[in-house]
Amino acid sequence: METAAQNGSSNQTGTARVKRGMAEMLKGGVIMDVVTPEQARIAEAAGAVAVMALERVPADIRAQGGVSRMSDPDMIEGIIDAVTIPVMAKARIGHFVEAQILQSLGVDYVDESEVLTPADYTNHIDKWKFTVPFVCGATNLGEALRRITEGAAMIRSKGEAGTGDVSNATTHMRKIGGEIRRLTSMSEDELYVAAKELQAPYELVVEVARAGKLPVTLFTAGGIATPADAAMMMQLGAEGVFVGSGIFKSGNPEQRAAAIVKATTFYDDPDVLAKVSRGLGEAMVGINVEEIAQPHRLAERGW
């Protein structure tokens, strides 16, 4: 898998090492959802390491319902032109043509995202065929390893997007971390059984067991609305944070964005966290995840 796969519309190649290296450069940072060039500029000024360009933040996607698809190319290009930091954009699970379009537009990363309506309930995108690196969500180690096998260069624990409720984010991050720790104590013959249970290649399972971590960057997402939320996820083992509705659905987006960036950097310093948490205004109202019926939970999408 170290050899590059080539996309039909490009004569460039992107090896796993290059793609994963690009994701490594975002470690320790915050990636913010933005729907306009102005929001993108606010995110960049606040210290975001990248922005996610989309037409509706997850809270609006959840509230408005219907089929949610890739954003309009004009909107994505407007955000690319507005900032100097990397720009990500979302494609539907399994929709390889949306991914081809996003690569053609020149986005820096494609997020094969459960926030959008899945296009294929059996297959995820073959990410090895693309030069652009992919981000994918996971609720457990098995999901993460299957996405890496398909070519993902970054994993984000899913959480429950658009809620402002961090409980699922903590559940998924603890689950992934706990399953990795379990692997590290196994003998090689036990790892064969673990690979079957995880539905992942044995060689990849062994690599994780020996390293005690994923071979790609692990961010967190879903329900992060305050500096304390971001710091907690970093203390639980996240290497960076995605923030969606939590910033631009709040009372003071500019200040909250900067506070979450600082909290992500100084996640283990309670004095700094207390300082940046002051006077932020009202956080997004949000939804209690327990009030969302199982079939309507976005984190359930993907397999």
From Swiss-Prot:
Assembly and interaction partners: In the presence of PdxT, forms a dodecamer of heterodimers.
Annotated metabolic or biological route of this protein: Cofactor biosynthesis; pyridoxal 5'-phosphate biosynthesis
> For this chain's UniProt record, which GO biological process terms are given?
amino acid metabolic process; pyridoxal phosphate biosynthetic process; pyridoxine biosynthetic process
Protein purpose: Catalyzes the formation of pyridoxal 5'-phosphate from ribose 5-phosphate (RBP), glyceraldehyde 3-phosphate (G3P) and ammonia. The ammonia is provided by the PdxT subunit. Can also use ribulose 5-phosphate and dihydroxyacetone phosphate as substrates, resulting from enzyme-catalyzed isomerization of RBP and G3P, respectively.
PANTHER family linked: PYRIDOXAL 5'-PHOSPHATE SYNTHASE SUBUNIT SNZ1-RELATED (PTHR31829:SF0)
Q: Which residues form the active site?
A: K90
Could you tell me what reaction this enzyme catalyses? Answer: aldehydo-D-ribose 5-phosphate + D-glyceraldehyde 3-phosphate + L-glutamine = pyridoxal 5'-phosphate + L-glutamate + phosphate + 3 H2O + H(+)
Name of the molecule in the record: Pyridoxal 5'-phosphate synthase subunit PdxS
Q: Which Pfam families match?
A: SOR_SNZ
Query: Where does this protein hold D-glyceraldehyde 3-phosphate?
Result: R174
Per the UniProt entry, what species is this protein from, by scientific name?
Mycolicibacterium smegmatis (strain ATCC 700084 / mc(2)155)
SUPFAM superfamilies associated with the record = Ribulose-phoshate binding barrel
Q: Which domain of life is it from?
A: Bacteria
EC supergroup of this enzyme: lyase
Name of the coding gene: pdxS
